[in-house]
Amino acid sequence: MAFLALGINHKTASVDVRERVAFTPEQLVEALQQLCQLTQSREAAILSTCNRSELYIEHEHLGADSILAWLANYHHLSLEELRASAYVHEDDAAVRHMMRVASGLDSLVLGEPQILGQMKSAYAVAREAGTVGPLLGRLFQATFSAAKQVRTDTAIGENPVSVAFAAVSLAKQIFSDLQRSQALLIGAGETITLVARHLHDLGVKRIVVANRTLERASMLAAEFGAHAVLLSDIPAELVNSDIVISSTASQLPILGKGAVESALKLRKHKPIFMVDIAVPRDIEPEVGELDDVYLYSVDDLHEVVAENLKSRQGAALAAEQLVSVGAEDFMSRLRELAAVDVLRAYRQQSERLRDEELSKAQRMLANGSNAEDVLIQLARGLTNKLLHAPSVQLKKLSAEGRVDALAMAQELFALGEGSTDKPPQ
């Protein structure tokens, strides 16, 4: 049995590649089914966020190259282009990687908590698609437990930092007084919710939430005293917006150069600060060419993020140790499970032989045989039957020169150096 974790992330691939390899929520079930068909496995999950796209697979039949080829073909990339950015982890390394990801140790923002929720969503989607079996199910549960322990036992979650926090921190650097600024937030997901919370806590003058559905926008707006509008209202809202932060799941840009250019004219070229957190991007890159626009992508947030990480570096060392212990413990328990079927079959065979010898002894007693003689024969018969198959196999292994197997058998039967001593009289 083999586990495989492969994919790309913010450290190995540019935003251009990441947005091309991202899965939409609507694609996930179909992609999972294709993946399981390819690997001849019933167990697979896909984690796709703005910073990473990863496949988690239990497999026996295919190597990583075949799965990478499927991923490249699915997203219409050349295999060479994908391979240049991809990483592959197997078995113990795959388990450790998943636990590091869920704990926020592999995130753009060290220790950020959102990734655990995204990992749980990936697990839920895979379960709904019927592609999580007992092995991958155990791995996800162990991963969640490890991430929880990291949060509980280390300070990695203190001094909150995230992509959302980094975006707001950058806005603070550009606008000295956020209380006089107006913000337009595009989207209504988890990241935008965090952005809204940070801006609200900083006392931003006015917040507008634009979303595909007014109902979802209104729910988020109500939480922070903001205003809700539809995506179609964005051009009008741009005129009054000093800060624009966008994070949707749209496959096409929502905000283009023309709309921003028109808004700037009406604003008399008062600057607009924009952060596009989405992958694929919500804001056309050409918008950044405008003189009075400060446009940042996810990749541009690295420097801001670095300033907020210093307090977490020490905690990360302790977290890495917890993850290593968790991964080792999981693999140890998994290997123990591999012996369960063998032990069950051996026990059933032993019980069958016991019952045969016991029935024979009971018949002898019923026929008047001496009880002591019956017990001796029962013990001798049971011993001979239990040792017959192992004896035959050991002689065969010895004839074949399998010294390693003989040494393993000695360990299996706990035959120490003193095992040949005569029993006490």
Swiss-Prot record:
One of its GO terms (biological process) is protoporphyrinogen IX biosynthetic process from glutamate. The keyword Iron-sulfur does not apply. NADP(+) binds at residues 187-192. GO terms for molecular function: glutamyl-tRNA reductase activity; NADP binding. Pathway: Porphyrin-containing compound metabolism; protoporphyrin-IX biosynthesis; 5-aminolevulinate from L-glutamyl-tRNA(Glu): step 1/2. Homodimer. NCBIfam families: hemA. Catalyzes the NADPH-dependent reduction of glutamyl-tRNA(Glu) to glutamate 1-semialdehyde (GSA). This is Glutamyl-tRNA reductase.
